Amino acid sequence: MTEYCAENYTLQLGYHIVALITILAGGTGSVKLIRGLASQTRELTVISNIGDNIWLHGLYVCPDIDTVIYGLADILDKSQGWGIRNDSFGFIRQMEMLGEQTWFRLGDRDLATHLLRTNMLKNGKNLSEITDWMRNKYAISTKIIPATDNPVETKIITDVGELHIQEFWVKFRGEPKVTDIVYAGAERSRVNPDAIHALKRSKVIIIAPANPVTSIGPILAIKGIRKELILERKKIIAVSPLIGERAISGPAVKYMRALKIQNSPLGVAEYYSDFVGTFIISRTDRNLAAKISRFNIKVYETDITMDDSKDESRLASYLLKQSKSF
């Protein structure tokens, strides 16, 4: 067992870690690493993407927040990366019979989450309070913080018009040509003060291997977050969401091209270069290490795939090991 002690925290690799760790995360591409970190540390905070939140059937749905909650509660449908395992779909079938649009499949058990959230919003609770209530209901020790309590929606500008990210990816199957991406409401939003507090007090800040444009991008668009990350640059580790030109999860490549971000780990590193001090890439991308280091970023190579719980814990341990120098 490797042990590292500094100031008021301890890293004990291969065992439970007592540390102040914050991760910026989306959903499907992030929850694996979040699970791995949660298996290693007793003090983990997730700053969650809110850009894919959407109103459907009169209910407020927060796909990334819910994926993190379900993943940590061990009820996530891992085969599809979202929703609740073995859920039923009677509600959706009934809505379809009644002629309603059912392109976004809400499971019956999943529906309870959205119904309760919506009722609590109507009764004056904010998204942070509701999310904290839910994670406590599932006995989750990891803190989950929405980047803001204000409405922010990622909009995909396409050749068929402006689409909410869920419409683009689910309803239209990601087929329209993408010309731009905007974070509607971000300029008017107020950063969650708990998110800033978590960034300031953490010894390690991790950027999950999530879509840099539509999962991490909306978080960065919230006023104050990117500024704080720049101040904390030395303690920030990002994991590449790409291996070569292939996204580990989801349609990152299409979004990156729309914003003219190079389709490679090098492109992601450049996109993050003002606030990331350490970048983790796949061993198969070692030829990019020297170019990435020109951004004054430390580069490490390892296996960044996560196919099972052992992989999740392995990568989490590796990241924490690299943080020894912070």
Model-derived features: where do they sit?
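C-terminal functional extensions of proteins
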Residues: S249-F326
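Active-site glycine-rich loop that binds ribose-phosphate moieties when present
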Residues: T179-L199
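Short, flexible loop segments at boundaries between secondary-structure elements
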Residues: R233-S249, I304-D307
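Electropositive, gly/pro-rich neighborhoods at or near active sites that engage anionic ligands
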Residues: N49-Y183
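A short helix->loop->beta-strand "cap" motif at the edges of active sites that frequently abuts
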Residues: R42, E232-I236, I297
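Extreme N-terminal starter segment of soluble prokaryotic enzymes
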Residues: V18-T22
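Charged helix-capping and loop-helix junction motifs
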Residues: P218-R226
